Amino acid sequence: MTSSMSPAPAPAYAQVMEDMEKGKELAAQLQGLLRDSPEAGRFVDQILHTFSRAMRALDKAAVSAAGGEGSEVQSEVTCGGGASAGGKRKAPAADRKANCRRRTQQSSGNSVVVKNLDDGQAWRKYGQKEIQNSKHPKAYFRCTHKYDQLCTAQRQVQRCDDDPASYRVTYIGEHTCRDPATAPIIAAHVIHQVAAGDNDDGCGGLQAGSRLISFVAAPAAPVDAAAAPTTSTITTVTAPGPLLQPLKVEGGVGSSDQEEVLSSLTPGSSAARGGGGGGGVAGPFGPDQGDVTSSLHWSYDAVAGMEFFKNDEVVFDLDDIMGLSF
């Protein structure tokens, strides 16, 4: 009776496993097409995980059934016709699952043989394991920007057995990240704002002639010294770091209460610190309209005397800074 019932489950088991493997491969291909959508990629990952878990559960059920009256059926399915005795029947099943995983990975990746591993991308190694019937281990890499830019690109590297100087590299997915070194430099620019009374943004009644300086991303423009009027307030900020472009000069002429504000971020300059050699131009004006040349030097001793402003917005009023010495 056992021999008459044993052939029945074998085709059903093989058909179920074949369909699930096919569905898993299709889900892996779909994952490669949805790399640009992190949310869709997470759903595909869950689908692949569900397929793998169902296949493992089906294998366990088949192994449990093999311990009873269907032992010869499990031997036929896992060994492919080569019957084995005792607990050795589980080893071919494990090999078959490993082969399924390898086929899935190869179907969604592109393999190349190279001499140099430097491909111009930023990779981080997260694992390595020994490969059966291979002399060299396989290393697993992910994109460095997996978490900050949600880039899911991966690569696998293994030294070739027949040519140790060459590497077989398998790329899975495509890079969707951007190198931070190519990002636009954040520069400061001057926003011209003249307001009377209270404002909706909570600045609280700027007087005419006030200047609101906001440090946000904007293209810098060269300063035309000849076009600047005689009455001006020049602010020079000296700080360590790369050279930034001069800030844009904005302001109107024709009104006595609208002086020009010129800000520039440059490395340390002896002329700016000394206040001579063209640092300030004396004008034929009274004490209430004189030129103010200020130089801010960045140091740890000077930090204690500095006032920090909320939201990186600083309001300079000419009536408040007249006569101050920096």
Curated annotation (Swiss-Prot):
GO CC annotation terms, alphabetical: nucleus
Ranges annotated as spanning the membrane: none
Comp. bias regions, Gly residues: 273-283
Mutant lacking the gene: phenotype: No visible phenotype under normal growth conditions, but mutant plants are compromised in benzothiadiazole-induced resistance to the rice blast fungus Magnaporthe oryzae. Enhanced resistance to the bacterial blight Xanthomonas oryzae pv oryzae (Xoo) and the bacterial streak Xanthomonas oryzae pv oryzicola (Xoc). Enhanced resistance to bacterial pathogens is associated with increased accumulation of salicylic acid (SA) and jasmonate (JA).
Domain of life of the native organism: Eukaryota
Region Disordered, annotated ranges: 67-114, 252-288
Residues in the DNA-binding region annotation: 112-180
Subcellular location: Nucleus
GO MF term list: DNA-binding transcription factor activity; sequence-specific DNA binding
Biological process terms in GO annotation: defense response; negative regulation of abscisic acid-activated signaling pathway; negative regulation of defense response to bacterium; negative regulation of response to water deprivation; positive regulation of salicylic acid mediated signaling pathway; regulation of defense response to fungus; regulation of DNA-templated transcription; response to cold
Main location: nucleus
Keywords: Activator, DNA-binding, Nucleus, Plant defense, Stress response, Transcription, Transcription regulation
Pfam families according to UniProt: WRKY (PF03106)
Classification via InterPro entries: WRKY_dom, WRKY_dom_sf, WRKY_plant
Tissues with expression: Expressed in aleurone cells.
Induction: Induced by abscisic acid (ABA) in aleurone cells. Induced by salicylic acid (SA) and infection with the rice blast fungus Magnaporthe oryzae. Induced by benzothiadiazole (BTH) and salicylic acid (SA). Induced by cold stress. Down-regulated by drought stress.
Family the UniProt entry places it in: Belongs to the WRKY group III family.
Additional detail: Plants overexpressing WRKY45 exhibit enhanced resistance to the rice blast fungus Magnaporthe oryzae. Plants overexpressing WRKY45 exhibit increased susceptibility to the bacterial blight Xanthomonas oryzae pv oryzae (Xoo) and the bacterial streak Xanthomonas oryzae pv oryzicola (Xoc).
Role according to the record: Transcriptional activator involved in defense responses against pathogens. Acts as a positive regulator of defense responses against the rice blast fungus Magnaporthe oryzae. Acts through W-boxes, which are cis-elements that are enriched in the promoters of several defense-related genes. Plays an important role in the benzothiadiazole-induced disease resistance by mediating salicylic acid (SA) defense signaling pathway, independently of the disease resistance gene NPR1/NH1.
Protein name per the record: Transcription factor WRKY45-1
Gene: WRKY45-1
